[in-house]
């Protein structure tokens, strides 16, 4: 009997459950689609040199971890449905049904609809998974062909995940209904909330921000004491002063405002804190750029600490802006009587002000989450494009190995090897070789061998014949030099202004074999690999062969190009052999370390990690975006249910249906527009700062044009999602207030 009642109630209330069905179906679709490539039954055609098993485990962990956020969304949607049906539950309880039974029936309804949503979501996920497969094949450079596939293990994982989530949420709903009194269920929609000025949300945030300011002041003072130098350039001095002065002044205002809050008023007090927070953020976010430009010597924990301060400062700014925007709405309403009583403005202001306390908290959380989502959407193509672009520079040769002398402190211990293990492996496995080059790199002066100051290592030099051999391997034209000339080869990420400044200061090169002058054609920047550069340098000197014979060889390299790509298993065996024979970090001191790269395994590793990163960021951004827009929509639809009577009164007073729809549009415009606008503004600032900090890498590895195309696509997707949610909410809101 109960099963029939559950089915009948679900069928009768399908309109009420529509938002629940759509949300759950969308969540299941995304979950199945992104998780499908981790299935043990997933075997795309990508060639013998690739192996996707590297990304299956990481993909499963990343997607399942991010999907825990869906537990909150499922909980919120269930609570929305619970509130929506409170009157119905009260009537059933009044007629004699036990509240425990009511709770179980509600759980049965939601569980039945969950199974329906999961079924539809898996079918849609099979279609969407083709998009994920196309992304994966594009990452490996393989063509995409549609193939309908079904993965039983992914289906079981999807069903299990959402069933467990629904059971956890459903048990909570049953407990809530058991503890609720009938009168509470009957009158829940009539309860008023506290006015905005009595909300404790913002005062608590101010207290936490005051504690943060004290911490920032302490850190800024310590860094000033240990790192400040009067010889620093003016921008660095301003940064040090700002990291002490602005937190101190803001903290002083916070203390004074707390003491004199009755005279000042909370809104003025918060305006002062907001101004201080903006000023405090300026020197904090300048640290990374100044560290990059002037090598200030801040260690990673210090930079991470200031990053934490910057993020916390932004969160406070968002909270303050949302609160002050709502306070400004109330002030604007009361500032002029004619404005308040113009047409239906009084009703609109009443609608907005009645939920300011709750909505301020919700809008703040949504704004922060939405900002994070937008940042993830934009940062995803930057990070993944950077990673793939860097791969083109790192894994240039099929096999490459280079020694490093930075841990060798005696010239006698410098390695002198031709890497014979590679030769033996090639012969043993019958690998066809296209090009094979072994060469050394030198220090211009032997005294430079003992120079080990970080960021001040000397550039290496390469003989002209070896440099031209490298260029030939990569398909570049050879270069020529006079016997008394030298040229330079620069890292792909080096900026033009840095190259020009360096060349202007280094027109002569002092070597142990004499002085060389700069060639007329002295700058080359084609990608030739990462290993030819010394630590913390972006340039290599190209010198005549006769000069190189006199200099001290400190780095030994071997680059091999094969006729055909190495199979993955063969490449893995070679990588393990090189790791044993030429360790990156030798156990003994005063021995050289080695950097080895096998193209096949490196490409597999980087593409796998890159795809996991890209998929995780996009999936996380979509989940957060859906959560924010769903919460916004549900909040307004819940208000529509509560305020149905108010709109019916306006209708009876003669207000036309067109004007009522305009009121709805204005109300939705405020509650949708406020957090979204704030999130977009903050995201633009954060993303602008991030793009500026990695501008050199973007130019070198991605290209501004390609990045703008990707960002444009992302903006279009975000705008489409927003429009769909806004229009859907508007239509459902109008339908809700028109029912009676």
Question: What residue ranges belong to the model's regions?
Answer:
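N-terminal Sec/SRP start-transfer signal
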Residues: 1-29, 196-207, 263-265, 269-272, ...
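Interfacial "coupling" helices/loops that link adjacent transmembrane helices in transporter permeases
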Residues: 5-16, 72-112, 189-196, 630-669
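Selective transmembrane-helix segments that form parts of the transport pathway or gating/packing helices
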Residues: 14-20, 106-124, 159, 163, ...
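Peri-transmembrane interface segments
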Residues: 15-22, 33-65, 83, 232-249, ...
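Small-residue-rich transmembrane alpha-helices
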Residues: 29-40, 76-80, 113-142, 154-179, ...
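Conserved transmembrane alpha-helices of multi-pass membrane proteins
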Residues: 51-68, 140-168, 195-208, 234-248, ...
């Amino acid at each position: 009997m109960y099963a029939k009642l559950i089915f009948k109630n679900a069928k009768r209330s399908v309109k009420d459950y529509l938002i629940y069905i759509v949300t759950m179906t969308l969540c299941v679709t995304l979950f199945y689609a992104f998780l499908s490539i981790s299935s043990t039954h997933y075997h795309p055609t990508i060639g013998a040199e690739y192996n996707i098993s590297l990304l299956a485990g990481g993909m499963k962990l990343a997607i399942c971890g991010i999907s825990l956020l869906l537990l909150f969304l499922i909980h919120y949607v269930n609570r929305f449905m619970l509130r929506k049906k409170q009157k119905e539950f009260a009537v059933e309880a009044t007629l004699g049904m036990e509240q425990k039974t009511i709770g179980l029936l509600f759980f049965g309804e939601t569980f039945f609809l969950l199974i329906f949503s999961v079924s539809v979501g898996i079918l849609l996920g099979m279609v969407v998974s083709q998009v994920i497969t196309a992304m994966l094949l594009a990452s490996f450079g393989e063509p995409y062909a549609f193939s309908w596939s079904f993965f039983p293990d992914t289906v079981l994982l999807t069903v299990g995940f959402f069933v467990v989530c629904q059971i956890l949420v459903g048990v909570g709903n049953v407990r809530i209904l058991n503890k609720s009194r009938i009168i509470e269920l009957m009158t829940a929609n009539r309860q008023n909330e506290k006015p905005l000025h009595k909300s404790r949300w913002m005062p608590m945030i101010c207290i936490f921000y005051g504690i943060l300011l004290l911490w920032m002041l302490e850190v800024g003072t310590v860094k000033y004491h240990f790192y400040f130098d009067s010889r620093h350039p003016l921008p660095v001095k301003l940064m040090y002063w700002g990291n002490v002065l602005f937190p101190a002044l803001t903290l002083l205002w916070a203390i004074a405002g707390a003491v004199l809050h009755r005279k000042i008023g909370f809104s003025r007090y918060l305006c002062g804190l907001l101004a201080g927070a903006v000023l405090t953020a300026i020197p904090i976010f300048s640290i990374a750029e100044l560290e990059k430009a002037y090598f200030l010597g801040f260690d990673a924990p210090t930079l991470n600490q200031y990053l934490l301060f910057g993020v916390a400062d932004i969160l406070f700014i968002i909270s303050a802006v949302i609160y002050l925007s709502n306070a400004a709405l109330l002030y604007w309403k009361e500032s002029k009587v004619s404005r308040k009583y113009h047409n239906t403005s009084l009703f609109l202001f009443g609608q907005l002000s009645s939920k300011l306390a709750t909505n301020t908290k919700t809008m703040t959380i949504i704004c922060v989450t939405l900002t994070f989502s937008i940042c993830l959407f934009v940062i995803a193509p930057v990070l993944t494009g950077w990673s793939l672009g860097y791969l083109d520079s790192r894994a240039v040769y099929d096999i490459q190995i280079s020694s490093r002398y930075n841990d060798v402190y005696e010239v006698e211990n410098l390695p002198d090897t031709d890497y014979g293990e590679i030769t033996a492996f090639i012969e043993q496995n019958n690998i066809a070789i296209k090009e094979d080059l072994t060469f050394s790199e030198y220090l211009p002066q032997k005294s430079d061998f003992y120079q080990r100051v970080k960021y001040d290592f000397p550039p290496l030099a390469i003989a002209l014949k070896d440099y031209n051999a490298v260029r030939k391997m990569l398909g570049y034209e050879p270069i020529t030099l006079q016997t008394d000339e030298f040229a330079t080869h620069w890292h792909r990420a080096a900026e033009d202004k840095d190259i020009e400044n360096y060349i202007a200061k280094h027109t002569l090169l002092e070597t142990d074999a004499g002085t060389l002058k700069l060639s007329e054609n002295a700058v080359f920047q084609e990608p030739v690999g990462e290993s030819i550069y010394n630590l913390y340098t972006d340039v290599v000197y190209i010198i005549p062969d006769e000069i190189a014979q006199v200099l001290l060889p400190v780095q030994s390299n071997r680059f091999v190009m094969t006729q055909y790509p190495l199979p993955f298993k063969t490449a893995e065996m070679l990588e393990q052999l090189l790791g044993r024979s030429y360790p990156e970090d030798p156990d003994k001191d005063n021995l050289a370390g080695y950097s080895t790269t096998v193209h096949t395994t490196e490409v597999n590793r980087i593409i796998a990690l890159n795809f996991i990163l890209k998929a995780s960021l996009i999936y996380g951004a979509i989940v957060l975006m859906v959560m924010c827009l769903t919460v916004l929509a549900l909040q307004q639809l819940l208000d529509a249910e509560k305020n149905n009577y108010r709109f019916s009164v306006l209708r009876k007073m003669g207000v036309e249906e067109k004007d009522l729809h305009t009121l709805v549009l204005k109300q939705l415009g405020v509650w949708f527009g406020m957090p979204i606008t704030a999130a977009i503004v903050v995201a633009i600032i954060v993303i602008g700062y991030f793009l500026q900090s990695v501008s050199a890498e973007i130019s070198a590895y991605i290209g501004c044009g390609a990045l703008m195309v990707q960002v444009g696509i992302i903006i279009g997707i975000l705008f489409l999602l927003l429009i769909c949610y806004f229009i859907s909410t508007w239509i459902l809101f109008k339908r809700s207030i028109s029912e009676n």
